Amino acid sequence: MSVLAPDAVEGLFDQIAPIYDNLNDQLSFGLHRLWKRMAVKWSAAKPGDRVLDLCCGSGDLAFLLAKVVGSKGQVIGFDRSQALLSVAGDRARQLASALVIDWQRGDALDLPFPDDHFDAATLGYGLRNVPDIPTVLRQLQRVLKPGARAAILDMHRPYSPLLRQFQQVYLDRWVVPAAAAQNCAAEYEYIDASLEAFPQGQQQVALAIAAGFQRAKHYELAAGLMGVLVVEA
């Protein structure tokens, strides 16, 4: 569960939208792009599919999905932050490609899509920021077709005490100072508290099964600093 109210989370991401992509590259040394490609692969999206990128942010996963589903498929990028959706739309226009993505603003707690609608879905760095994780998982399960997969990528607190210490030093001495240089220190200080409140891998699996998914498996990435929850409706 997010440690901030929904409007506060929306305001936070609206604030960091202009620097979001550059700072993500800097803070992850570009590795977030590799992890996102892995998430798209785990989603099992294929040409011609109708797919959802929930909490799409500036659109990285949506662009990757659009390349997979091709001109006969459909991608919806869905987010609460209008500022990030504007960044995503600007990026799409700059690419000037044949990729067609429908950007929609709304609430992940109440998705405006019919049941059994999507062939696959992704959710990158968003589940940690929602106010009610079980409700979002139930909504995601509802809109996926039976047998469809979703891949949910996010940061995690690792189980290892040594790695937890490393993560804390990384956040305190690298992430927040780098954000401070962009006048966004307060926004990135929020990451620490959000990680403390975020369920770890096996807890996420249990939540997914309780939400109605038939199968769920959590994969650790980067020694447990990141992870992907793969679920099947």
Curated annotation (Swiss-Prot):
Q: Which UniProt keywords apply?
A: Methyltransferase, S-adenosyl-L-methionine, Transferase
Organism from which the protein derives: Synechococcus elongatus (strain ATCC 33912 / PCC 7942 / FACHB-805) (Anacystis nidulans R2)
Protein name (record): 2-phytyl-1,4-naphtoquinone methyltransferase
Provide a GO biological process annotation: phylloquinone biosynthetic process
Work out whether the entry's keyword set contains Transferase.
yes
| Lineage: superkingdom | Bacteria
Keyword S-adenosyl-L-methionine present in the record's keywords: the answer is yes
**What are the recorded GO MF terms, alphabetically?**
2-phytyl-1,4-naphthoquinone methyltransferase activity
Q: Which PANTHER family match?
A: 2-METHOXY-6-POLYPRENYL-1,4-BENZOQUINOL METHYLASE, MITOCHONDRIAL, METHYLTRANSFERASE
- Coding gene? menG
Catalytic activity of the protein: demethylphylloquinol + S-adenosyl-L-methionine = phylloquinol + S-adenosyl-L-homocysteine + H(+)
Q: What class of enzyme is it?
A: transferase
EC number of the protein: 2.1.1.329
Could you say which protein family the record assigns here?
Belongs to the class I-like SAM-binding methyltransferase superfamily. MenG/UbiE family.
